[in-house]
Swiss-Prot record:
It catalyses: (2R)-3-phosphoglycerate + ATP = (2R)-3-phospho-glyceroyl phosphate + ADP. GO terms for cellular component: cytosol. Keywords: ATP-binding, Cytoplasm, Glycolysis, Kinase, Nucleotide-binding, Transferase. It is an enzyme of class 2 (transferase). Substrate binds at D21, F22, N23, R36, H59, L60, G61, R62, R119, R157. GO terms for molecular function: ADP binding; ATP binding; phosphoglycerate kinase activity. Belongs to the phosphoglycerate kinase family. InterPro entries: Phosphoglycerate_kinase (IPR001576), Phosphoglycerate_kinase_CS (IPR015911), Phosphoglycerate_kinase_N (IPR015824), Phosphoglycerate_kinase_sf (IPR036043). Its EC number is 2.7.2.3. Pathway: Carbohydrate degradation; glycolysis; pyruvate from D-glyceraldehyde 3-phosphate: step 2/5. This is Phosphoglycerate kinase. It comes from the Bacteria. The lineage of its organism: Bacteria, Bacillati, Bacillota, Bacilli, Lactobacillales. GO terms for biological process: gluconeogenesis; glycolytic process.
Amino acid sequence: MAKLTVKDVDLKGKKVLVRVDFNVPLKDGVITNDNRITAALPTIKYIIEQGGRAILFSHLGRVKEEADKAGKSLAPVAADLAAKLGQDVVFPGVTRGAELEAAINVLEDGQVLLVENTRYEDVDGXKESKNDPELGKYWASLGDGIFVNDAFGTAHRAHASNVGISANVEKAVAGFLLENEIAYIQEAVETPERPFVAILGGSKVSDKIGVIENLLEKADKVLIGGGMTYTFYKAQGIEIGNSLVEEDKLDVAKALLEKANGKLILPVDSKEANAFAGYTEVRDTEGEAVSEGFLGLDIGPKSIAKFDEALTGAKTVVWNGPMGVFENPDFQAGTIGVMDAIVKQPGVKSIIGGGDSAAAAINLGRADKFSWISTGGGASMELLEGKVLPGLAALTEK
């Protein structure tokens, strides 16, 4: 990576500003998935071991008005982080002002402070999300000229807490998580060991147009599953019953199929049900066509076998989007089948592009079998599209 990293700067005795991604799910004030906190630990630990004073910034959920602040405080995160680090985490509970500044000024080497949810600043004119220059400048002034961005999950956004701070410090560098994310995803797409197979699922073609276009140029094969299958089917005149379809994307699907030169591999059967919820019948289709009054909710057994064959010998695999409604045991066979086909390839570099695929791998007990699971759905999608991420572009060149 041509950007400075946290290892390139002297941290001892410095107030080091760090953008982490602690946007974790909370239920009644309890964290239900702490993966993002765990993912940030190597960078935080490195800073404090080097004698730096870590000042952490993160958003949590969406905050547009005062009422939205309820249940969006980072207080539970501060407590969880303290337990994981085995030391106190100072939490003033504010995003600016005398109380925050006083707490920062008395920090000692090796201590950690967490600023309150950066999106609290969105209540008054969306200052965080619109990268208000004064806010970025103010937050930058709280440190000693070093900013570490370790929040891959927001690297595709230009906010005050990443791009804004970067613009106002002497050195803006990448943390270990950001560095790893870029290394795995960008290298997989730009300089893959071949054969390189991409697998794209999820419900909407519209979400993945740019990704499909970019990967058709870069990958040896692109396998399509999930709800967007049926938009591709309908574009070819195949009956889809009541399956999900994006009527306004049929021309796009047709154009992608024409452009693909046989690289785009679609399912050859589906698992269909007579309703999305409260169904009374589930069965495998004979071929591609979905029966009248039914809708496809997963890829079928023939498709699993076809995808297994397409993955044989693959050395690089990037997967983004489940093959079906994996949350329901009746429709998770496709996602499980594809995961198992990926991880059994000898010497494969297997990467999950965040979001629902990451949840599927974790929930279905396959997470530890993959080379890398991205922490950022939207950011990884933009990297897969070949886009430049603002949070990354704002870092200091080596």
